[in-house]
Amino acid sequence: MGSKRGISSRHHSLSSYEIMFAALFAILVVLCAGLIAVSCLTIKESQRGAALGQSHEARATFKITSGVTYNPNLQDKLSVDFKVLAFDLQQMIDEIFLSSNLKNEYKNSRVLQFENGSIIVVFDLFFAQWVSDENVKEELIQGLEANKSSQLVTFHIDLNSVDILDKLTTTSHLATPGNVSIECLPGSSPCTDALTCIKADLFCDGEVNCPDGSDEDNKMCATVCDGRFLLTGSSGSFQATHYPKPSETSVVCQWIIRVNQGLSIKLSFDDFNTYYTDILDIYEGVGSSKILRASIWETNPGTIRIFSNQVTATFLIESDESDYVGFNATYTAFNSSELNNYEKINCNFEDGFCFWVQDLNDDNEWERIQGSTFSPFTGPNFDHTFGNASGFYISTPTGPGGRQERVGLLSLPLDPTLEPACLSFWYHMYGENVHKLSINISNDQNMEKTVFQKEGNYGDNWNYGQVTLNETVKFKVAFNAFKNKILSDIALDDISLTYGICNGSLYPEPTLVPTPPPELPTDCGGPFELWEPNTTFSSTNFPNSYPNLAFCVWILNAQKGKNIQLHFQEFDLENINDVVEIRDGEEADSLLLAVYTGPGPVKDVFSTTNRMTVLLITNDVLARGGFKANFTTGYHLGIPEPCKADHFQCKNGECVPLVNLCDGHLHCEDGSDEADCVRFFNGTTNNNGLVRFRIQSIWHTACAENWTTQISNDVCQLLGLGSGNSSKPIFPTDGGPFVKLNTAPDGHLILTPSQQCLQDSLIRLQCNHKSCGKKLAAQDITPKIVGGSNAKEGAWPWVVGLYYGGRLLCGASLVSSDWLVSAAHCVYGRNLEPSKWTAILGLHMKSNLTSPQTVPRLIDEIVINPHYNRRRKDNDIAMMHLEFKVNYTDYIQPICLPEENQVFPPGRNCSIAGWGTVVYQGTTANILQEADVPLLSNERCQQQMPEYNITENMICAGYEEGGIDSCQGDSGGPLMCQENNRWFLAGVTSFGYKCALPNRPGVYARVSRFTEWIQSFLH
């Protein structure tokens, strides 16, 4: 019988060893799980820490005020100057941070760029972990203050300039060239090395600015016009054909043409037809130093020759027109040094301007024209070569025009003529207001002479001219046309050079077209005396045109004790050239109240006396409608009501209590209550004497009691002078009241009025003058050669170029950080809109207005000396205020003002400087000119200038034999005399008879007669 087998289910107990091993295994499992969790958390924390800035970069900046001078090489990161200065500054920054509280976090630094303005440094700081910008700035300032770097012996850093810029970058690993992504300042872009920023307009300009050259990458810079950028080789082409604008914004296509050194470039245009807003600019050179040589639009310019081996061509597309063929240009290289004189001169303008070039220092450019000019009453109807509308000629700018201007055309340098040669040409001078055409010969020795000149209207025909040339040194020929505003076109054609002297001309000498007599008499009659109720008057022929060359006078009268308010109901004069002048009284030396010109409206004018003189003075060019005016009389018209006896009247008419006068707080809106609170009394010069303080309305003399060196310095500063030089007690017999001075704990002065001084001793103080009249950049190593010559850069750091409407018109002198002294006749009629003036400080070359040494400033206030008399040329001085103060540099410094009693004796050699014409009515200088001239006595000057009244307000200088003088364009500039190693402003260039003629000195406003008036603006 089978049986069934079962499995036993009985229980087996564990041994103690088994239990122990099981427990250990469980513990190990728990530990492993814990370690894994901790590791994960650590990794996450590490990632979070990196995200929070475990590696950190900050961008900072500061300004170096001394120890190094800015130069343009600092813009080039590859230059030795950049590398040396960057190395020294990085060493300085490293030393500061490695001795700071951030030494453990700090890694290194990198200088990015230098900017002009003393020297502004931009640099990056690298840290191992995140640091706040406040902490970075604080540690940097503390390190600079504590001189924590050996480099601070050399460099002085402006602590107020230290700042952390907006850029703050953090990364999760150390900064290396392979992974840093740089952020650039506004207006700049990064190079492909991701380490360097350069200005955006430096890309694709023909000059390498990025260390890796990526800013001139041919692929990146390829134009949308034809896909090209850099054109090399002896010939090539570029084009912009059928160029509809591809976007809403303007499009710029730019090409760089580069041929072998020593060669020049000829541009030819197979096709050229663009919309008038789409302009092709042709520049000589590349980069920031390129010079605009031609701007072309609409019609084919023919051939353009650029005398450089590099050309920049820039096509600006503004329109969205699609029916213009654009242009197709080719270029070829040529060697201009192989040209002879005849090839350089001969030109009929059928092939562009041939080898003639536009004068960059004139006021406008010659135009190449086919057919008639703009106006039917001036200029040719056709060229001279073919005598029909198919040929070309050149003309001064056509159209109505807006100003008087010189238009110059220059030859290439010509070789000395071994035998005489005849320069011939055809000229066209037709128009009622045609001025002048001249031919000048100049050489490298700055010698210039006029060899041909014609003035006036010669009718609507081409006239023949010729000049024999016989020069012994290299020279240039210059055609200069002087154009008036309208009806004054001058044209040239068929210029040629032939062997031998010029023979008698086969063509008759042209005769002037008689000038029609003026339609109206220039004498207005009068002067007209006007009394109430006959108070309305107007210019002659109003509202029709007033006469040219008019001089009209109205004298307005009121009863004694009253004054006059003049109101212009209508006003329309030719701007600048025609003026209404208003004076306070009838006498010739009455004060100038206003000069009005241009279109109205104009402000009312108030006299301070019971008489007012109104003058209308016009020139000989244009006339407009004139003016209609009326006047009223009354008591205190336009004058604020006088204040009560216990109040002070501010300059703006406000009244403030006398107790608030000179209390250290401004109560007048114009600040005049704190303007005149301390002065010298009984001194020998304007920087010494007894000290007086105004307390309320009473002047108190300072006691010697408790006087200290610090008080001397504080008082000198209040007086607008330098530090205290010396002080000593004196024992006068003068009565009080007196004032005792003490220094408060916070440094301000405490004034205590007193009826008596201790031991009756007063203080006599002498202050140092503020630093002025010092040359820092260009010291004279040898005595200057007497005669006009190019000045060194920085030789006259106070000489300022004054530009009006973009044209250098006058000079000026810097006398403080925000005030200039110039001539009144420069700004007369140009004073109503000061912002049209721009002062260029630190200027050396007119062709380089963007030099790092130059600083432009708009003018925001013009004050003509109220005693200025234009007709007598007396008191010819004016003040001009800069919109913003200027920082002094090696190239910008103030000149010293003379004492009121300072004498510059006759016979002393002083200096003049300016950019004016180098010959009378010739071309202006590009580089600042300087010369020495001897001073003359006023008696001698009066003998040599008998047609003028030489007053005590004038000083004269010049050689009896002539040859050296100020000239047109130098007006307003300085006459400078040196004393005790400082330069003083002795005179302001005013007037003369022509320029540099024998026994015809230059006349200058004598500045010592105006020192007090000038200083009233400075303090």
From Swiss-Prot:
CUB domain boundaries: 225-334, 524-634
A biological process (GO) of this protein is:
proteolysis
At which residues is a lipid of type N-myristoyl glycine covalently attached? Answer: G2
Q: Where is the MAM domain?
A: 342-504
Q: Which residues lie on this side of the membrane: Cytoplasmic?
A: 2-18
Predominant location category:
membrane
Q: Does the keyword Transcription apply?
A: no
- Extracellular side residue ranges read 48-1019
Give a yes or no for keyword rRNA-binding in this entry.
Answer: no
The UniProt catalytic activity note for this protein reads: Activation of trypsinogen by selective cleavage of 6-Lys-|-Ile-7 bond
Bilayer topology: Single-pass type II membrane protein
Q: Name one GO cellular component term.
A: brush border
Q: Where is the SEA domain?
A: 54-169
Q: Which GO terms describe its molecular function?
A: serine-type endopeptidase activity
Q: What class of enzyme is it?
A: hydrolase
Q: Where in the cell is it found?
A: Membrane
Q: In which tissues is it expressed?
A: Intestinal brush border.
> Which InterPro entries did the record assign?
ConA-like_dom_sf, CUB_dom, LDL_receptor-like_sf, LDLR_class-A_CS, LDrepeatLR_classA_rpt, MAM_dom, Pept_S1A_enterop, Peptidase_S1_PA
Covalent S-S links between cysteines: C184-C197, C191-C210, C204-C221, C225-C253, C524-C552, C643-C655, C650-C668, C662-C677, C757-C767, C772-C896, C810-C826, C910-C977, C941-C956, C967-C995
What disease is this protein tied to?
A: Enterokinase deficiency: Life-threatening intestinal malabsorption disorder characterized by diarrhea and failure to thrive.
Subunit-structure text: Heterodimer of a catalytic (light) chain and a multidomain (heavy) chain linked by a disulfide bond.
Q: Which family does it belong to?
A: Belongs to the peptidase S1 family.
Q: What is this protein called?
A: Enteropeptidase
Native source species: Homo sapiens (Human)
